[in-house]
Each structure stands twice: as C-alpha cells, then as structure tokens.
C-alpha cells in the first residue's frame, strides 16, 4: 500500500499487512473454439501451452510487478485489463485464464471454450482486502469497506443498495 492507497484488493498476501479474507474467484483457461489448442482434440499439457500465445494481465503493483498467471510461454501479450484479455482471446488471439463470471456470455455464445487441460484448467485464488495501516480511514472509506464486504459473497444479480448505518 506504500501510503499511496487507503484500500487494496489483492490475490496475494502483502508482507507487513493484515488483509481481510474475501471470496475466491474461479479463473478458467480458455481459447476461441477455432484456436489451435482446441484442434488437438485431446487433453492438453503444460508443454502444449508453452508454444502458444498467452494473454496475461499486467499487475498494477508498484513493487515486484507480476504478469498474473504467466506460464513462461514463448509468446505472450501483456494487457492492462481483464476486458482487453477477454476481447483478444474471444477473437482468436491466444489463450488466457479468465474469471468465469466475466466470460459467461462468451462461453454461452461459443466465442470462448474451456481448454481441456490435464491439470490446472481452473484456478480459484482467494482475494484479500487491505486497508492503510499508516493513517486512519475516513467515513467514506469505511462505507466502501462495508459495501465491499456486503457484496463480496452476494450473487452477481443482487441489486446494489447501501448498507444501513445506525
């Protein structure tokens, strides 16, 4: 957090900070149905993925940034958002691990298809909510924390309404 952010949500444990555990998110390895990986018509291995273009999401961390989910594939494109990755992969450019809840429409419409991996086709990282330990949180930030906690486990179809404060 480095004194820059009041709140952070991360899939990583941040050394020196105590995070509040939130939900896990299912990430699915996917590619367009016409992608070469789907043409093998068999269970895929890590070696099959190494020679293919992998689309990875740039980590926004300032120290030790990581390309999230990168396998070390020979070719990779690093993009700035999950939406961009979804657009690239659903148009036939590479493969990626993407959050299932964000790609349900593409899966349903046949723009994306889960890769038949022998292992690791689904990942379920747990996310953590961190708040600044360097300064007290203001009322607006506390309301945001309450909203995040309230809707963290709510179905995506839940209407968003602010929590009631006494």
Positions of PLM-derived features:
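Short, Asp-centered acidic motifs that coordinate Mg2+ and/or phosphate
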Residues: 2, 6-7, 95
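C-terminal regulatory
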Residues: 14-93, 98-123, 146-166
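A bilobed periplasmic-binding-protein/Venus flytrap-type ligand-binding module shared by bacterial periplasmic
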Residues: 30-34, 126-137
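Short, charged alpha-helical segments
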Residues: 124, 136-139, 143-146
């Amino acid at each position: 957090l480095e004194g820059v952010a009041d709140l952070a949500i991360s899939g990583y444990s941040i050394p020196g900070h105590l995070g509040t555990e939130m939900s896990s998110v299912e990430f699915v390895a996917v590619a367009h149905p016409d992608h070469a990986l789907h043409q093998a018509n068999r269970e895929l291995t890590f070696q099959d993925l190494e020679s293919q273009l992998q689309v990875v999401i740039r980590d926004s961390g300032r120290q030790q940034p990581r390309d999230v989910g990168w396998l070390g594939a020979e070719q990779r494109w690093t993009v700035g958002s999950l939406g961009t990755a979804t657009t690239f992969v659903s148009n036939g450019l590479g493969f990626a691990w993407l959050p299932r809840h964000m790609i349900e429409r593409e899966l349903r419409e046949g723009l994306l298809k889960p890769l038949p991996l022998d292992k690791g086709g689904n990942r379920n990282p747990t996310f953590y909510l961190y708040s600044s330990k360097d300064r007290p949180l203001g009322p607006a930030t506390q309301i945001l924390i309450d909203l995040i906690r309230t809707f963290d486990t709510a179905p995506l179809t839940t209407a968003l309404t602010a929590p009631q404060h006494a």
